[in-house]
Amino acid sequence: ASDVYKRQVNMNCTFVDNNRIDIGSNVLIASNVQIYTATHSTKVDERMVQDCPEEQEICRTYALPVRIEDGVWIGGGVVILPGVTIGRNSVIGAGSVVTRSIPANCVAVGNPCRVIKQIDNIVSV
């Protein structure tokens, strides 16, 4: 058996890859999808770098990987935030903001993105 590595990424997508973005086989990514790995602390005193010159505003940044497993379909305009895994064969509805990992074999939508349905009778490709 041979490995299949098909991936389709439509136009105007943004991948901010300060860390790994792993995309599995047979993944469909619609247009205007944004995937971010960079993030900042929510605490202002942890965000700003101390003892830097006044003319420079420097923020501490860290990055978390994003993983999109095999068979995933990501609808148009979806935003995927740092540290998220989207499980095998799942579908993310258009316009969703994925703030937490999504399990395999489900449909998830919204802001924040939530599972609304399990997908049964999956045929692997």
Protein language model annotation of sequence segments:
Residues 35-46:
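Proline-centered turn/helix-capping motifs that create local helix->coil transitions or kinks
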Residues 13-15, 45-46, 52-53, 58-59, ...:
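A short linear-motif detector with a strong N-terminal bias
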Residues 6-11, 16-25, 30-31, 36-37, ...:
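Left-handed beta-helix
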Residues 39-41, 84, 118-120:
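Conserved catalytic-core motifs of eukaryotic protein kinase domains, centered on the activation segment
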Residues 1-5:
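Short, small-residue-biased leader/transition segments that mark boundaries at the very start
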Residues 48-81, 111-125:
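C-terminal segments of enzyme domains that contribute to small-molecule binding surfaces
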